[in-house]
């Protein structure tokens, strides 16, 4: 389903085949982990956005999945992922030790699965997941602009 929807979205830019492949891989991972809560509007909305408007950030999330698959110190957290419309990993892709990274709908780099970390995911990182969905291909540009302007103000 993800591949077909992404292929349809990609056809608007003559990228139907690569978009369909990315959507199929992303959708396959999400489906195998029962990621989306199909009986709630948020789950359907998340799926549609992840495979259309936010396909760029969903593509980036595949990097997190690849690193997680190749890392020995990584574990998937079903309790924070299943029917939550997001993938969550202890360990995995990290830009800096001690920092959590959200790429698309994938949260990586948690130090542990304790209550404090769970709250971080549900109260903070989930906001980034939904920002990536709502802003779609604009999100990476807006995020970098926010970081640059914050750094400039901090100087």
PLM region spans:
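Auxiliary, metal-adjacent structural segments of Zn-dependent hydrolase domains
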Residues: 3, 50-101
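Post-HEXXH active-site segment of zinc metalloproteases
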Residues: 132-155
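Generic hydrophobic alpha-helical membrane-segment signal
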Residues: 38, 93, 112-116
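Terminal accessory regions that mediate trafficking to/through membranes and regulate activation
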Residues: 105, 118, 145-148
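A residue-identity detector for tryptophan
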Residues: 38-41, 53, 130, 134, ...
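Active-site recognition of the HExxH zinc-binding catalytic motif
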Residues: 120-132
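Short pre-active-site segment immediately N-terminal to the catalytic Zn-binding motif
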Residues: 100, 107-123
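N-terminal low-structure segments adjacent to metalloprotease catalytic domains
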Residues: 1-64
């Amino acid at each position: 389903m993800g591949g077909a929807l992404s292929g349809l979205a990609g056809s608007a830019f003559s990228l139907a085949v690569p978009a369909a492949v990315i959507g199929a891989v992303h959708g396959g991972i999400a489906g195998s982990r029962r990621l989306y809560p199909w009986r709630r509007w948020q789950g359907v909305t998340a799926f549609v956005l992840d495979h259309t408007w936010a396909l760029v950030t969903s593509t980036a999330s595949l990097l997190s999945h690849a690193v997680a698959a190749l890392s020995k110190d990584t574990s998937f957290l079903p309790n924070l992922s299943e029917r939550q419309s997001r993938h969550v990993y202890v360990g995995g892709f990290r830009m800096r030790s001690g920092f959590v990274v959200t790429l698309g709908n994938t949260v990586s780099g948690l130090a542990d699965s304790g209550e404090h970390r769970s709250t971080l995911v549900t109260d903070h990182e989930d906001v980034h997941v939904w920002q990536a969905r709502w802003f779609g291909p604009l999100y990476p540009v807006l995020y970098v602009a926010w970081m640059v302007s914050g750094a400039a103000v901090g100087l």
